[in-house]
Amino acid sequence: PSLVGSEMCIRDRVNMGEDVLFSGTVGCATQGYLLGISSVAFSLRMQEGKKAPWDTVRIALKDLIEKIIRLHIIRPILWNVNLPSVQPENLKGVRVVSLGSRKADQKPFVQVNPYGETVYWMGPMGRPKKSDHDTDFSLNAQGYVTVTPLTTDRTDYQRLGVAKEALASIEADEKI
């Protein structure tokens, strides 16, 4: 295939910022990418009680998908695409952006389920940081389709040298 398209995730929280780290939608697209095929994780931001703007999706994705397929010239690319929940006349265009970030999540909470068991729920996600202007959070909220090329390498290169230095004695002592 020329392209793997991972499910259209439709919900009030899309795959932006840190969400890509634990998203099943992005995980599915990553599998295609690891098989050597350009892949896209699609998400549509929905507002509770509103119908999905499928005309907007059709308009936004028509040219975008064709261009994404053409970009797989040298090597595959892993894409994250978030569509805003706006009517076609309010769609502002497409922007290639970096991932934004959120403030800390709210604290987990405890409840008792219908079977009398104690369950622990993660608290709601934190709000996007206001300082993130040209990111997926900001521009998607303004009515843009946001497109982010992703990588599977989650190595923190800024801390790699410090970690090697701090753990050098352990590395030297370790016998394999």
Where is each model-derived feature located?
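Glycine/threonine-rich flexible loop motifs
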Residues: 14-23
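Short, glycine-/small-residue-rich phosphate/pyrophosphate-handling segment
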Residues: 40-67
